[in-house]
Swiss-Prot record:
Disulfide-bond pairs as recorded: none
Annotated GO CC locations: cytosol
Gene3D superfamilies on file: Phosphoenolpyruvate/pyruvate domain
Alphabetic keyword roster: Carbon dioxide fixation, Lyase, Magnesium
Cofactor(s) required for function per UniProt: Mg(2+)
Keyword Cell division part of the UniProt annotation: no
Role: Forms oxaloacetate, a four-carbon dicarboxylic acid source for the tricarboxylic acid cycle.
GO molecular function: magnesium ion binding; phosphoenolpyruvate carboxylase activity
Catalytic activity, EC: 4.1.1.31
Source organism of this protein record: Pseudomonas fluorescens (strain Pf0-1)
Key word Lyase present: yes
Protein name (record): Phosphoenolpyruvate carboxylase
Name of the coding gene: ppc
Family according to the record: Belongs to the PEPCase type 1 family.
Length: 876
């Protein structure tokens, strides 16, 4: 057993014991014995004995016991997560190696210096990096903000008990605090009774910044600066902000009628309020600390006749921040003109801070300047006055419908009936026309009015508060031009990045020609004024074609875009729309970035961070810092040491794998007439739509699999542990390649091609979490007899996938090379197994009894969904 295993088990045992005390206090010893019997049964079952007994004890639970049993195992899993997260950041002995996340940047910089990169070029490249992490809301982020704060406090107590020199009384005090926090969490309802609004989701995102990223960014920058100095003798300039944040929360209206123009306006104002409030706290601390009198002439000129010039300048800034916060707050309820002292430009925030910083250095007080003042400056450069840049996202069909209404009103015919050439000709002409397209008396329908109102909000908002306008389900050049025209008509006079999102297999294959067409159109380059941004969709392409074909289509699309932009001498910014799960393009960010096509990460990288992964990757400051380090190092490495392009043999084999993969995937998902009904019966998919998990509906419209959003599609299969979308297709594709005698070539690709290695590693990870026996238990409780053979067939395919991956990696067990990860999975299974069996029982009762919303069965079902999501650490 490794050191991490032993410590992790100790912490989990302690937290479990304290939770047991809490449960005993509420329900008595007999009930706690029942929980313990179920837990031990699950543990024994993993060793192959008591399955029937475990199922029977769960099936015999009375209606009153369902919810507390589900809650007990849900809380066990959340506490196991806290212990695991803490193990990633716990205090290490001097003799132990620092974790990879801490070493990765210093080691990379040393390697780059050894390979001949000059100190100046490295410092310049690091300072110029543009990495943007786009925080998105997530229907399956089931943990409430209240509980997340309690979990963070529990993690802090685990850290406190790690100190070697604690007295017995101090250790006892920590245990008492842990007991109280666990009791508070247990007695707090873990599930929302009502769906969160888009504004609630945005506030959740701001809370992650306030409680974690606000601390993590300056610490991360300080360490990056130290690593750069150690390797080159140079420092990061004050204006460097290699990692910034954007958000979709309150801006993503694709398929979500609850995100309106008014919501977008409210979220933009809340971000300004929150930013001003956070800077006020910083400036208050600085004013208390910077009591020095000696100052530069420039600072004295700004401070006026003051014996404490730093405090005088900071007081002026404090007044302006207070005015900004008060104005933003007042504007939430009524349109309020901004007073003269409201901050509008980031320079207004930076100038007084830089003045103080430079003055302290000039006067020999650099050690003071480089403390909290430098941290505040780093935050101001990273977060600015608007905290995050808000993207707007809408479906291309909404823009086409608006254009049709406009052209029909003007007597020009129906835009949607025109071919692509007619559309481009009309849009190009109107974009260059100085007169407005819309007459003042035009009365649009409600849908078109909402599209236009959103464009007007964009026009009214400060440019620096906004990111990109993303067009989902984009497929043609006219999709981009239509948005540019609607923005122009609404008074958007500055350039705004209008970004096509290519999501299906066909659209990914067509991405290159679409961008090439745009770049050759008259006037398009002038409107661009910056890089051409293109978003690559991972979720819908995988749902459409399976991950084998989708991954290769994404790779080829990026290669073609790099080539076209190079030919056209335009900079390219690729925006990766990844989910938290492998079926939605998720996986370790560091490996994913290093597996991108050569030239596609040229100092720029933009990616979505999904709701439930935001908490795991950025919820605690120390863990956030580790993940920021990984992003920074990976983007720098991919920029300066891009991987080699694949050989013709690798390409040919990848083409074959993709073709075999998509055929196998679609044979099951699209061509088997029983498949949709099997999916609905064997997973909680139907019930997920009823649960108050997010502000967005689970379906785009009525219909089969294609109408389902990618998230509930993945979520359903994850809950039953079949994990089908992440692996289906690979088992056939790899088996056929081996039958053709291409095993050696597959091994070479895995060894030498980061793209292929990363795909196989992520496939192995998801197969290690999949569990055919758990999936079978759902079938036995929920599926009609005529559909059972399909379930058996899918489990056979899962077994085939496991065998072929083991053959390829030369291991006897999945993840044998990663004992820590295996231990984390094993530890959780003891608590997950009862929840899966309980969920199958709850689904059976719910469907049989047609239960009311809010009933104990429905509540317990919700808790089981939350617990399994927490236990698997990725959901949809």
């Amino acid at each position: 057993m490794t050191d991490i295993d032993a410590r992790l088990r100790e912490d989990v045992h302690l937290l479990g014991e304290l939770l047991g005390n809490t449960i005993r206090d509420q329900y008595g010893e007999a009930f706690l014995d029942k929980i313990e019997q179920i837990r031990k049964g699950a543990k024994a079952d993993r060793r192959g004995s008591m399955d029937a007994e475990l199922s029977a004890s769960l099936n015999q639970l009375s209606e009153d016991e369902l919810l507390p049993v589900a809650r007990a195992f849900n809380q066990f899993l959340n506490l196991a997560n806290i212990a695991e997260q803490y193990q990633l950041i716990h205090r290490r002995e001097e003799t132990q190696a620092a974790p990879f996340e801490s070493r990765v940047l210093p080691e990379l910089l040393a390697r780059l210096r050894n390979e001949g990169h000059s100190a100046e070029s490295l410092a310049r490249q690091l300072a110029r990096l543009e990495i943007e992490l786009v925080l998105t809301a997530h229907p399956t982020e089931v943990a409430r903000r209240t509980l997340i704060q309690k979990y963070d406090a529990i993690a802090a107590q685990l850290a406190a008990q790690d100190h070697r020199d604690l007295t017995t009384a101090e250790r006892e005090q920590i245990h008492n605090t842990l007991q109280r926090l666990i009791a508070e969490a247990w007695h707090t309802e873990e599930i929302r009774r009502t769906r969160p609004t888009p504004v609630d989701e945005a506030k959740w995102g701001f809370a992650v910044i306030e409680h974690s990223l606000w601390q993590a960014i300056p610490h991360h920058m300080r360490k990056a600066d130290q690593a750069l100095f150690a390797a080159t003798g140079l420092r990061l300039p004050l204006e460097a902000a290699p990692i910034r944040f954007a958000s979709w929360m309150g801006g993503d209206r694709d398929g979500n009628p609850n995100v309106t123009a008014a919501v977008t306006r409210e979220v933009l104002l809340l971000a300004r309020w929150m930013a001003a409030d956070l800077y006020l706290r910083d400036v208050d601390h600085l004013a208390a600390e910077l009591s020095m009198q000696q100052a530069s002439d420039a600072l004295k000129a700004r401070a006026g006749d003051s014996a404490e010039p730093y405090r005088a300048v900071l007081k002026q800034l404090r007044e302006r921040l207070r005015a900004t916060r008060n104005w933003a707050h007042a504007s939430l309820t009524a349109t309020t003109p901004a007073p003269a002292d409201v901050l509008h430009n980031n320079r207004d925030l930076l100038d007084p801070l830089e003045l103080c910083f430079n003055s302290l250095h000039e006067c020999g007080m650099g050690v003071i300047a480089d403390g909290p003042l430098l941290d505040c400056l780093r935050r101001a450069v990273t977060f600015g006055l608007f905290l995050v840049r808000l993207d707007v996202r809408q479906d291309s069909s909404r823009h086409s419908a608006a254009m049709t209404e406009i052209t029909d009103y003007l007597g020009l015919g129906k835009y949607e009936e025109w071919d692509e050439e007619q559309r481009i000709s009309f849009l190009t002409r109107e974009l260059q026309n100085r007169r407005p397209l819309l007459p003042a008396h035009f009365k649009p329908s409600a849908d078109t009015a909402e599209v236009l109102a959103t464009c007007k909000e964009i026009a009214a908002a400060p440019g620096a508060s906004l990111g990109s306008y993303v067009i989902s389900m984009a497929g043609a050049a006219s999709d981009v031009l239509a948005v540019q025209l609607l923005l122009k008509e609404s008074g958007v006079l500055r350039p705004m990045r209008v970004v096509p999102l290519f999501e299906t297999l066909a659209d990914l294959d067509n991405a290159g020609p679409v961008i090439e067409r745009l770049l050759l159109l008259p006037g398009y380059r002038a409107r661009l004024q910056g890089p051409q941004e293109v978003m690559i969709g991972y979720s819908d392409s995988a749902k459409d074609a399976g991950t084998t074909a989708a991954a290769w289509a994404q790779y080829r699309a990026q290669e073609r875009l790099v080539e076209i932009c190079r030919e056209q001498q335009v900079e390219l910014l690729l925006f990766h729309g990844r989910g938290g799960t492998v079926g939605r393009g998720g996986g370790p960010a560091h490996a994913a970035i290093l597996s991108q096509p050569p030239g596609s990460v040229a100092g720029r990288f933009r990616t979505t961070e999904q709701g439930e992964m935001i908490r795991f990757k950025f919820g605690l400051p120390d863990i956030a810092e580790q993940n920021l380090n990984l992003y920074l190092a990976a983007v720098l490495e991919a920029t300066l040491l891009p991987p080699p392009p694949p050989t013709p043999e690798w390409r040919h084999l990848m083409d074959e794998l993709a073709a075999d993969g998509v055929a196998a995937y679609r044979a099951v998902v699209r061509e088997n007439p029983q498949f949709v009904e099997y999916f609905r019966q064997s997973t909680p998919e139907q019930e997920l739509g009823r649960l108050p998990l997010g502000s967005r509906p689970a379906k785009r419209r009525a219909g089969g699999i294609e109408s389902l959003r990618a998230i509930p599609w993945i979520f359903g299969w994850t809950q039953t542990r079949l994990m089908l979308p992440a692996w289906l297709g690979w088992e056939t594709a790899l088996s056929k390649a081996l039958e053709r005698g291409e095993g050696e070539l597959l091994g070479q690709m895995r060894e030498q091609w980061p793209f292929f290695r990363t795909r196989i590693d992520m496939l192995e990870m998801v197969l290690a979490k999949a569990d055919a026996d758990i999936a079978l238990s759902y079938d036995e409780r929920l599926v009609e007899p005529d559909l059972l053979p399909l379930g058996a067939h899918l489990r056979d395919l899962l077994s085939q996938a496991c065998s072929v991956v083991l053959g390829l990696t030369g291991q006897s067990q999945l993840l044998a090379h990663s004992p820590d990860t295996l231990e984390f999975i094993r530890l959780r299974n003891t608590y997950l197994d009862p929840l899966h069996l309980l969920q199958a029982e709850l689904l059976a009762r719910s469907r049989r009894q047609n239960v009311e919303q809010g009933s104990p069965v429905e509540q317990a079902l919700l808790v089981s969904v939350a617990g399994i999501a927490a236990g698997l650490r990725n959901t949809g």
